[in-house]
Every structure is written in C-alpha cells, then in structure tokens.
C-alpha cells in the first residue's frame, strides 16, 4: 500500500472506496529487527519459544502473547502505523501464514492456537477503540483458526473473514452433503451460532 499510496489516494477519494490494509502481519509490528535489531537481545522472552525451549527470531514465530509488555509493544507499533495511515478503514490483523505459536508453559496454558489468536485480537481491538473509533479490526477464521474459540469469545466489534481455502466450488460452501465442504459447513454454522458480529466470506477463485 505504501508504494502506491500517492497514486491511489486521489482515486480512492474520487470513488468513495473503502480501504482495508494489513494481512498476515503480526510480525510487522514486533520482530527481531525491531529497534535496529536490538530487541531480541534486550527481550528474548518476548519472542516465541519452539518445542525444544528455544526462543526464535524467525518472523513466522508469533510473539510470546503471555508477555504483557510484548503485547503492549506490538499495540504501540500498530497505533503508530495507523496514525501514519489515517485513511485505513479496516485493519486486517492476521497471524503470519503458517504461524508457529509460542510453546512456553504460560502460552500453553492459554489453550489452542485459535484461543491465543482470539485473545490477542480482542486485546488489540480494545486498545485501538478509543483512538480510532472509525476503524474496524478484522481477523481470520482460517486453517487452524477455522473453528471459533470457546474460552475466549471474539468481540462482536471485530469482523471475521471466514476462509474456506480448500472448498469445492461444485456446490455451495455450506453444503454439508459435499465431503470437501462438510467441515466448512460445520465451522460456519458454529460461527453463526456463537458470534454476533459481522462475518465475511473470504473465497478463493
């Protein structure tokens, strides 16, 4: 977006286009290169731990979400980005594609990856609400996050992109009679039963 911003902003205003920015980008707001590369050395405990107990620098490892100061740092980084881009209407706050979540003892106690994902999204959405009242935060129901979390209920102020990445297009995505779509039909019904916010169908063609 930043590369094309100068060209596209006038067209956006002319056409009253709603702008969504973000994506698979937790790692853009806190990573081993932050603070000139000094952050990992200063706070290794903020970074995701692998199954062997090692803190990892790689961007696909999600931060240690049980570390409140790490989450606060990430939120401050998100706020800085949004202040510099006031034109954004919807902020897609998604984990890295193929994310590896922290396996420290405290993070394991938080539950599944889906539970940790929803917990973090709720925290970020709440932190942004006062300063950015016009903004919609969006998250994914996708792959390991396809089914709704149960322990952490997603805030209805957040939009959900329901992403049936492997659906069969020969029938409707919610057709439980289609073996390929059955899990999506089940998951979509669960989302509708437990979530009062907006659900978008993010389809792949």
List each language-model region with its residue ranges.
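Aromatic-lined carbohydrate-binding surfaces of glycoside hydrolases
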Residues: 1-205
């Amino acid at each position: 977006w930043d590369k094309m911003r100068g060209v596209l902003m006038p067209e956006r205003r002319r056409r009253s286009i709603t702008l969504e920015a973000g994506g698979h980008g937790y790692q853009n707001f806190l990573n081993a290169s932050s603070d000139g590369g000094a952050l990992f050395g200063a706070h290794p405990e903020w970074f995701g731990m692998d199954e062997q107990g090692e803190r990892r620098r790689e961007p696909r490892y999600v931060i240690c979400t049980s570390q409140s100061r790490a989450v606060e740092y990430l939120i401050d980084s998100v706020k800085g980005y949004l202040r510099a881009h006031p034109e954004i209407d919807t902020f897609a706050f998604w984990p890295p594609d193929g994310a590896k979540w922290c396996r420290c003892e405290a993070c394991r106690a938080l539950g599944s990856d889906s539970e940790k994902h929803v917990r973090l999204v709720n925290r970020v959405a709440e932190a942004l609400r006062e300063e950015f009242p016009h903004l919609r935060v969006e998250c994914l129901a996708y792959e390991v996050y396809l089914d709704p979390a149960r322990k952490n209920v997603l805030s209805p102020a957040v939009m959900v992109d329901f992403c049936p990445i492997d659906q069969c297009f020969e029938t409707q995505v919610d057709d439980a009679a289609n073996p390929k779509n059955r899990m999506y039909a089940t998951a979509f019904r669960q989302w509708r039963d437990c979530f009062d916010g907006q659900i978008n169908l993010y389809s792949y063609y």
